[in-house]
């Protein structure tokens, strides 16, 4: 009560921010007559004038009124469009490192030109981020004439572009691209082997369109660049055959409940749990299939990977549904984005889940991948010096934007008052009754010539509604992940009189629905339209537009509530743009996922008590309140998941930054010999310490062990025992110095043969490759640690603190391994003259031919039998190069049969 009273007196924070900015809007408006007097050349010259002023130390902020006035005037001349005052406010909000909530149809694309131009004046580059390639290309091409008129270059960053084209796009003043592509380019740049391979500049200013979709909906999905791991597709197929034998039970076994099934599903947490009965059956089936030995347990350490396969297969069958979570197209399983309804080509689920779904659907199973580099959007966008975003629905997530990204949300008022009617929800008992009511509503609306947009939450639901509409003889368009190619065209014409469009989730976001349809789309469809044709198209459109306005504007039907209120608001926001009339209504049933999982049982109890007859709907504030509470519950849970993900990823992020900084420094120098010399000292000190403890008695020294270690790991033959026998005065300190000096001398002799320049190049390559290899292994180890760390909670330990502690220890160990591996590799390198290499190659070819002849005579030749036996053993188990050779010769595999294979 008191807060409301204070807000009335002093205004909300939002009001105060807008009040401050309106003063600047007045200044911009006052400059308009002055700008109108300038010639085109004088207006264009303003850009160089602003750049010169910034060069002399003037701040970008001080240029706001003048720069915005210049962009507004240029837009009038180039597009014939003048920025509204609310768009100027939006531009200032975006420049202020804030999120601008601007309703659908308020011209966010044109608003973005203001802060993009202003921040590009510094010459550091501006990245405009969109949700898909179509919008990136459309916005770049639409705004290019304006920016080029003002002397600014525009680049488009699309997937699959060659590196030189990408470098050129990033070098432009303003670059348009998708969130995925910017993130992947960052990861690829940090895997480059030369500075010339990198494409990005320093990350300066990011302007994110549909910021809620990118920074919230996709925050749980990390960007991963991966390489192939071992092939285990056969195992997925075998385990997949077993899963259909299992029966699902309603809930998990407990002290009070013992079910008859084999597994239970927790829909809320999206987890599957095997029951005792299920575990016994799975083990029996695995033994029958010959995958596991009799008497073995699925939980024994040797069967960890098998358990992983079973869990993945069970999740694929119980939690992931075709045409809801994924589609199958051209023999490939493609993920469907749960928030936008779009397909995510090229994205794959991790932890073997994607392979399990492929096995379930009977398509070709692609190899599992190993992570080479990864980053979350949360951490990528926090790398920018300056970040801002815009969307039609941000206010419900303002707390998350503030706590995670330190971005305030400012609600920008609409240019004209909103007059859309949001009708109360109607709740039915069954899904069938609800669908029937939706069909009746559509019939009624279209009979009056009112266009209808039906929003569904999955492809499956959109197809159910489509079938019912077809039965009822109602012509309609379907827009979902299966038909997204003609997305913009369908959305543009969704405002036609009596048009019915079914859209999955928010597919088609970013394209305005114009009442009466889009006359621009009709003109674009003609090859060379004449002035008369264009005038006729506009006149026809005006008639349709007026008819739709008279019918009540666009009507929105939601077939069920989404988990997030924000996505419901996005659907509603498609109607009532720029002060147009419109209406919206959500139809729900007690069988909807949200109602079933999260809304309390009281709602269904209340409906039964009211004695509702089939086909009747309930419309009551209590029900609406229960639904809103259910949505809040889900939003809060999803926020906690994202926050927790970020807290864990922050640990990896600190390490990632350290590694990438080190790697970039390494890339930018041509001579790393000082670093090599420094780490050589550290490595030899640590190696000697293991066999000659510092300040210890000679009796404690392990000289044979040290000699063997130096030979095996550094290819150094050092008669240390002989030195000590011949030189009694040789003590610990001088011995250490001699070992190090000898290693340096051997290394320098190699350098003399190949030349200093070649050696420097080789050193740098070894350091980069070793760093990448160990970082890849470290990422895999961090993944394993992350998956099991929650179990520490049972030991009364904080899993987050344990994760931080262990991952730091692993990181420190990785850095030590890096030093050791680099020095070991450089020490072992064999320098050969060209003629020696040729002779060795000849010898290798002769041995290969001899081996081929031996294998042809294998039934007569014992030696070939050994080779065949060896091949069988290596097929079962991968033999390391330094392992003993299975033929029994006593030699290492690489020096015996490994050399022949």
Swiss-Prot record:
CC cofactor note: May bind 1 zinc ion per subunit.
Protein's GO biological process: intracellular protein transmembrane transport; protein import; protein targeting; protein transport by the Sec complex
Catalysed reaction, written as an equation: ATP + H2O + cellular proteinSide 1 = ADP + phosphate + cellular proteinSide 2
InterPro entries tied to this protein: Helicase_ATP-bd, P-loop_NTPase, SEC_C_motif, SecA, SecA_CS, SecA_DEAD, SecA_motor_DEAD, SecA_preprotein_X-link_dom
Residues involved in Zn(2+) binding: 885, 887, 896-897
CDD domains from the UniProt entry: DEXDc_SecA (cd17928), SF2_C_secA (cd18803)
Induction line: Repressed under conditions of excess protein secretion capacity and derepressed when protein secretion becomes limiting. This is regulated by SecM.
Assigned keywords, A-Z: ATP-binding, Cell inner membrane, Cell membrane, Cytoplasm, Membrane, Metal-binding, Nucleotide-binding, Protein transport, Translocase, Translocation, Transport, Zinc
Swiss-Prot/TrEMBL cofactor(s): Zn(2+)
Entries under Pfam families matching the protein: P-loop_SecA, SEC-C, SecA_DEAD, SecA_PP_bind, SecA_SW
Membrane topology reported for the UniProt record: Peripheral membrane protein
Gene Ontology MF annotations: ATP binding; metal ion binding; protein-exporting ATPase activity
Cellular component GO terms held in the UniProt record: cell envelope Sec protein transport complex; cytosol; plasma membrane
SUPFAM superfamilies: Helical scaffold and wing domains of SecA, P-loop containing nucleoside triphosphate hydrolases, Pre-protein crosslinking domain of SecA
Residues that coordinate or bind ATP: 87, 105-109, 512
SMART domains: SecA_DEAD, SecA_PP_bind
Enzyme Commission no: 7.4.2.8
Subcellular location: Cell inner membrane; Cytoplasm
NCBIfam families, sorted: PRK12904.1, secA
Function: Part of the Sec protein translocase complex. Interacts with the SecYEG preprotein conducting channel. Has a central role in coupling the hydrolysis of ATP to the transfer of proteins into and across the cell membrane, serving both as a receptor for the preprotein-SecB complex and as an ATP-driven molecular motor driving the stepwise translocation of polypeptide chains across the membrane.
Quaternary state and interactors: Monomer and homodimer. Part of the essential Sec protein translocation apparatus which comprises SecA, SecYEG and auxiliary proteins SecDF-YajC and YidC.
Family designation: Belongs to the SecA family.
Protein name: Protein translocase subunit SecA
UniProt source species: Salmonella typhi
Lineage: Bacteria, Pseudomonadati, Pseudomonadota, Gammaproteobacteria, Enterobacterales
Gene name as annotated: secA
């Amino acid at each position: 009560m008191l807060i409301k009273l204070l807000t009335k007196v002093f205004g909300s924070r939002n009001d105060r921010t807008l009040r401050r900015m309106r003063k600047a809007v007045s200044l911009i408006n006052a400059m308009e007559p002055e700008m109108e007097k300038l010639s085109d050349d004088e207006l264009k010259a303003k850009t160089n004038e602003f750049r010169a002023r910034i060069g002399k130390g003037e701040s970008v902020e001080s240029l706001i009124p003048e720069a915005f006035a210049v962009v507004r005037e240029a837009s009038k001349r180039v597009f014939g469009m003048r920025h509204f005052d609310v768009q100027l406010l939006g531009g200032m909000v975006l420049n202020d490192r804030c999120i601008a909530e601007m309703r659908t149809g308020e011209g966010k694309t044109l608003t973005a030109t203001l802060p993009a131009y202003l921040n590009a004046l510094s010459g550091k580059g501006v990245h405009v981020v969109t949700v898909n390639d179509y919008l990136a290309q459309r916005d770049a091409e639409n705004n290019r004439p304006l920016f080029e008129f003002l002397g600014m270059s525009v680049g488009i960053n699309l997937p699959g572009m060659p590196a030189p084209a990408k470098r050129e796009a990033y070098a432009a003043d303003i670059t348009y691209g998708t969130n995925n592509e910017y993130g992947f380019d960052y990861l690829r740049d940090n895997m480059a082997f030369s500075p010339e391979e990198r494409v990005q500049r320093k990350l300066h200013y990011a302007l994110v369109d549909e910021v809620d979709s990118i920074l919230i909906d996709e925050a749980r999905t990390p960007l991963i660049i991966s390489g192939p791991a071992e092939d285990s597709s056969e195992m997925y197929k075998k385990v997949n055959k077993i899963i259909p034998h299992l029966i699902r039970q309603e809930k998990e076994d407990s002290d009070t409940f013992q079910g008859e099934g084999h597994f239970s599903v927790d829909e809320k947490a999206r987890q599957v749990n095997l029951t005792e009965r299920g575990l016994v059956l799975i083990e029996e089936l695995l033994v029958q299939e010959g995958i596991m030995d009799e008497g073995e347990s699925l939980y024994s350490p040797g069967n960890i990977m098998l358990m992983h396969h079973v869990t993945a297969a069970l999740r694929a069958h119980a939690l992931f549904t075709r045409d809801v979570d994924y589609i199958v197209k051209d023999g490939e399983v493609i993920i469907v984005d749960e928030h936008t309804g779009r397909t995510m080509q090229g994205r794959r689920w991790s932890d073997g889940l994607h392979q399990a779904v492929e096995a379930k659907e009977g398509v070709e199973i692609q190899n599992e991948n190993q992570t080479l580099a990864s980053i979350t959007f949360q951490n990528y966008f926090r790398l920018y010096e300056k970040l801002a975003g815009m969307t039609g629905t941000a206010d419900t997530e303002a707390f998350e934007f503030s706590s995670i990204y330190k971005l305030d949300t400012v609600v920008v008022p609409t240019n004209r008052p909103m007059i859309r009617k949001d009708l109360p929800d109607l709740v039915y008992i069954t899904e069938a009754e609800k669908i029937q009511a939706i069909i009746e509503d559509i019939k009624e609306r279209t009979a009056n010539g009112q266009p209808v947009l039906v929003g569904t939450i999955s492809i499956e639901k959109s197809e159910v509604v489509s079938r019912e509409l077809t039965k009822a003889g109602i012509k309609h368009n379907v827009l979902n992940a299966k038909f997204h190619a003609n997305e913009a065209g369908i959305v543009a014409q969704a405002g036609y009189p009596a048009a019915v469009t079914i859209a999955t989730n928010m597919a088609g976001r970013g394209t305005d629905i114009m009442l009466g349809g889009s006359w621009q789309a009709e003109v674009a469809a003609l090859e060379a339209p004449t002035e008369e044709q264009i005038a006729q198209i506009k006149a026809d459109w005006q008639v349709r537009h007026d008819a739709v306005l008279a019918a009540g504007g666009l009507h929105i039907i939601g077939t069920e509530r989404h988990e997030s209120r924000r996505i419901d608001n996005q659907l509603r926001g498609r109607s009532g743009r720029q002060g147009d009339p419109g209406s919206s209504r959500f139809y729900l049933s007690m069988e909807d996922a949200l109602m079933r999982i999260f809304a309390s049982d009281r709602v269904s109890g209340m409906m039964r008590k009211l004695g509702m007859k089939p086909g009747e709907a309930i419309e009551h504030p209590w029900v609406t309140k229960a639904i809103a509470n259910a949505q809040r519950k889900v939003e809060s849970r999803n926020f906690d998941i994202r926050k927790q993900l970020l807290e864990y990823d922050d640990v990896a992020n600190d390490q990632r930054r350290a590694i990438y900084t080190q790697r970039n420094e390494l890339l930018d120098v041509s001579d790393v010999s000082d670093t090599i010399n420094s780490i050589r000292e550290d490595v030899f000190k640590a190696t000697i310490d293991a066999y000659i403890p510092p300040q210890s008695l000679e009796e404690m020294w392990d000289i044979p062990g040290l000699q063997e270690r130096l030979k095996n790991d550094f290819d150094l033959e050092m008669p240390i025992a002989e030195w000590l026998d011949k030189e009694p005065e040789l003590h610990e300190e001088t011995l250490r110095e001699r070992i190090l000096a000898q290693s340096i001398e051997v290394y320098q002799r190699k350098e003399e043969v190949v030349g200093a320049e070649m050696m420097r190049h080789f050193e740098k390559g070894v350091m980069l490759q070793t760093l990448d290899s160990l970082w890849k292994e470290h990422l895999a180890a961090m993944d394993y640690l992350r998956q099991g760390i929650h179990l520490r909670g049972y030991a009364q330990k904080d899993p987050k603190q344990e994760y931080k502690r262990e991952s730091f220890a692993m990181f420190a160990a990785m850095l030590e391994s890096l030093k050791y591996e680099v020095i070991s590799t450089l020490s072992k390198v064999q320098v050969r003259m060209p003629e020696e290499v040729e002779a060795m190659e000849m010898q290798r070819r002769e041995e290969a031919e001899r081996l081929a002849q031996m294998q042809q005579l294998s039934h007569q030749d014992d030696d070939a039998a050994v080779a065949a036996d060896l091949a069988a053993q290596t097929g079962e188990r991968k033999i390391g190069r330094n392992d003993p050779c299975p033929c029994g010769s006593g030699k290492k595999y690489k020096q015996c049969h490994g050399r022949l294979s």
